A protein has these predicted regions:
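Hydrophobic transmembrane alpha-helices
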Residues: 1-54
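Alpha-helical transmembrane segments and their cytosolic interface
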Residues: 1-7, 150-187
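Hydrophobic alpha-helical transmembrane segments
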Residues: 6-11, 35, 39-43, 54-59, ...
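Structural signal for membrane-spanning alpha-helices in multi-pass inner-membrane proteins
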Residues: 16, 20, 24, 45, ...
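Short helix-perturbing small/polar motifs within transmembrane alpha-helices
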Residues: 18, 78-132
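Interfacial aromatic-anchored transmembrane helix boundaries in multi-pass membrane proteins
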Residues: 20-33, 61-95
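Alpha-helical transmembrane segments and their lipid-water interface positions
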Residues: 53-60, 68, 99, 136, ...
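Interfacial helix-loop-helix junctions of multi-pass membrane proteins
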Residues: 68-74, 138-153
């Protein structure tokens, strides 16, 4: 891994942390807050690709695990990894990988801007929405005993916001591809 890769991983981990400063919103009917950090996970996958995006999220999770208050709401420490919303945190790693992998495979420099943006959006939805929510629902059902149908129904409230975040990530991925073409997509 080059110095450039390390800097990009650290930069995007810092972006995820910064997005955690936006106060989370609790909906009340499910014990999972709505926050902006999942946007950072999608951005890491879309912009950095599978390897560096996954390493970015792994670094972010390590910072949270050692107790730094990097999660939304100023949370950190090993205890947050056992709480009901922890499945979504585990899903961040899967989300970054899936988003990055699909972005690397679907998006090429020869495509038109609309096609690139559409593929970035598909990748962000597949990783940042489907993969992350799958991990979150499975963990939520396991920890709370809700059962899969109830956990799934509870997570549906978050899907529209996450689709909006995927759209933002797609626009950002397209902008980076146009504005900074020297950033290698594959590492």
């Amino acid at each position: 891994m080059s110095t450039r890769d390390l800097v990009l991983v650290a930069l995007f981990a810092a972006i995820i942390v910064a997005l955690g400063l936006i106060p989370p919103v609790n909906l009340g009917f499910i014990p999972v807050p709505v926050h902006a950090q999942s946007l950072g996970v999608m951005l890491a996958g879309v912009v950095l690709g599978a390897k560096r995006g996954t390493l970015t999220v792994a670094l972010f999770m390590l910072l949270a695990a050692i107790g730094l208050p990097v999660l939304s709401g100023g949370r950190g420490g090993l205890g947050v990894f056992m709480a009901p919303p922890s499945g979504y945190l585990y899903g961040y790693i899967v989300a970054a990988f899936v988003t990055g992998y699909m972005s690397e495979r679907l998006v090429t420099a020869r495509q038109t801007g609309l096609v690139q943006g559409s593929y970035f959006f598909v990748a962000a939805v597949a990783g940042g929405v489907f993969a992350c929510h799958l991990c979150g629902v499975l963990w939520l059902a396991f920890v709370t005993g809700l059962g899969l149908p109830a956990a799934f129904m509870g997570t549906l409230a978050f899907v529209p916001g996450d689709v909006l975040k995927a759209l933002i990530a797609a626009f950002a991925g397209r902008a980076v591809m146009v504005g900074y073409p020297l950033l290698p997509q594959r590492a």
